[in-house]
């Protein structure tokens, strides 16, 4: 299991995954970060990454 640091300017882009930040984009972007779903496809449906919170910093746990 690898962890990618998704904190970026307060929004938290979920980079990491396939092709750098292709699949990782939907995981940890805006309100989708707070909901904790999505991986790549606009943050809908898929749950292959989940953002975790540590002191306000988002970490995307890539499974």
Swiss-Prot record:
Keywords: Keratin, Repeat. Pfam families: KRTAP (PF11759). It comes from the Eukaryota. GO terms for cellular component: cytosol; intermediate filament. InterPro entries: KRTAP_type8/19/20/21/22, KRTAP_type_19. In the hair cortex, hair keratin intermediate filaments are embedded in an interfilamentous matrix, consisting of hair keratin-associated proteins (KRTAP), which are essential for the formation of a rigid and resistant hair shaft through their extensive disulfide bond cross-linking with abundant cysteine residues of hair keratins. The matrix proteins include the high-sulfur and high-glycine-tyrosine keratins. Interacts with hair keratins. Belongs to the KRTAP type 19 family. This is Keratin-associated protein 19-8. It comes from Homo sapiens (Human). The gene is KRTAP19-8.
